[in-house]
Amino acid sequence: MKKVTIEEIQSDPNFHTHKFGPFLPRNAQILILGSFPSPSSRDNNFYYMDQRNRFYKVLNYVLQENCGNEADDRKKLLRKHRIALYDVVEACIIPDAKDSNIKMPILVDLQELLKNLPHIKQIFVLGLTTTKKLFIKIPSFHNCSKPVEYEKITTFLPSTSSANIRFPTDKLEEKFKTELTKYIS
């Protein structure tokens, strides 16, 4: 995969960058990677802010919590449970919120990101199609000194997007509960 630079794609009218950085609570033990922020998330400067996305509904179920709809409430919940968030794509051309429309992605430097997360026990990648394909292409995932260790601690989960009609909310809740509760202290 040819490495794309921001300079090559920034003149496109559908070019977007990750407006806000990774959410990295101190002592985070879980890293959840999505694809790229939706327009609602970019407008609200935080992850999974589209009201149709089921991420926080599922997380509330798993954690037996009830965080509100405000970014600050959601950050508090994530800090409490040592959950870090970021995305696989840092910049791309995307005309809408559909992952399948991501073009010319600039991928996260996973090795650099994990330097800031020394206590990570597990990485969860949300999305069994586009995000998984993009994650597997991350150069630092393959070129790092310990790629096997990353593979051992990486689990792919279904997307919480409302567009994911293959997984009704109750099935997402059970799948996430099974996987996340192994690592939540």
Q: What do the PLM-derived regions correspond to, one by one?
A:
Residues 80-134:
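Internal catalytic-core helix/loop-beta-alpha segment
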Residues 29-30, 122:
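Structural motif
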Residues 1-29, 51, 97-111, 139-185:
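C-terminal capping/extension of enzyme domains
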Residues 41-44, 133-136, 166-167:
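Short glycine-/acidic-enriched loop or helix-start segments at secondary-structure transitions
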Residues 40-102:
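Short, surface-exposed acidic-centric catalytic microdomains
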Residues 36-40, 53-54, 90-93, 128-132, ...:
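Short, solvent-exposed loop/turn segments at secondary-structure junctions
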Residues 30-31, 38:
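N-terminal strand-loop-strand
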